[in-house]
């Protein structure tokens, strides 16, 4: 419970996007909600991250997307001199914004990205990887999960295996990366 309260305080006092700031204020006196949202950090599963959207380390939001992308960027830069990534998104709430945030974060790390200009199905990203000669792909989708959810999915066969092999876990990322905004590239 103490870890969750500390994380909540850090987030509440950080320069967050307006929507997350409002949520931080809304849950201020709700210990159960704070615990649920901040009790753990999301970890990369077999195909990425999936969860409810909202404020917290245990939710999908702009900060979690940035941090995940920074971890993916670090990995790609360790394997490729000038990596390229294809980014797609579905029609869910926030998917387009999360795709844009992903592209900005990659650009800030010197990674070129190709973002679809409209929502696409997951196979389109796999096609884009091959068509553009990219080193990986990211799809913003929660697949079959309810509308309150979103996700950060790796359609490329290479990326999930690479992440598992390197044991790239989200908790280790959150200890190293700040809550401050990622500069745009």
Which residues make up each language-model segment?
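Gly/Ser/Thr-enriched, mixed-charge loops and adjacent short helices
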Residues: 11, 15, 33-38, 42, ...
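An N-terminal, well-structured beta->alpha segment
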Residues: 2-102
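Ferredoxin-reductase
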Residues: 9-11, 81-158
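Catalytic cores of nucleotide-enabled group-transfer and carboxylate-activating enzymes in metabolic
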Residues: 64-74, 95, 100-103, 112, ...
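Conserved short alpha-helical segments that host acidic/polar catalytic motifs at enzyme active sites
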Residues: 46, 107, 183
